[in-house]
From Swiss-Prot:
Family: Belongs to the FAM180 family.
Gene Ontology CC, one term: extracellular region
Keyword Repressor: no
InterPro entries registered for this protein in UniProt: FAM180
Gene: FAM180A
Protein name: Protein FAM180A
UniProt keywords, alphabetically: Secreted, Signal
Cleavable signal peptide: 1-17
Taxonomy, superkingdom: Eukaryota
Amino acid sequence: MHWKMLLLLLLYYNAEASMCHRWSRAVLFPAAHRPKRSSSLPLNPVLQTSLEEVELLYEFLLAELEISPDLQISIKDEELASLRKASDFRTVCNNVIPKSIPDIRRLSASLSSHPGILKKEDFERTVLTLAYTAYRTALSHGHQKDIWAQSLVSLFQALRHDLMRSSQPGVPP
């Protein structure tokens, strides 16, 4: 009887472990994996696939960004905004990254309990969320500024923790 229970527990543990690793990507940014039916958004869009695209993403973040009252992000520089990657940037910023305090706190909590290091696309989206949170912190006043600042710090700590883990030798992704 005890060996049957042990076997059942081992099977359960194995199933639980394999399910956690398989679905951990979708947990952090669910909007990337569930585009709206009416939109032509790509499934799981990624901005950086080469060094040139990383540099372009950096240029997008350094360019003057505009956030409309309905929280849509756009690039003010017309030349940069006309690039194909700028369209992907707008897609990720406007449809994938969280923009409300509860959603950002949920992301921070998920990041703090995330096993292993972040995948490239999750790291990228977390950095964009951090940039958005920094922008909102700068525009806020009083109690709202404190709330945005707390979210900013928690995202920064999660990213720093991920970078520390990824720099250690022998850490699995």
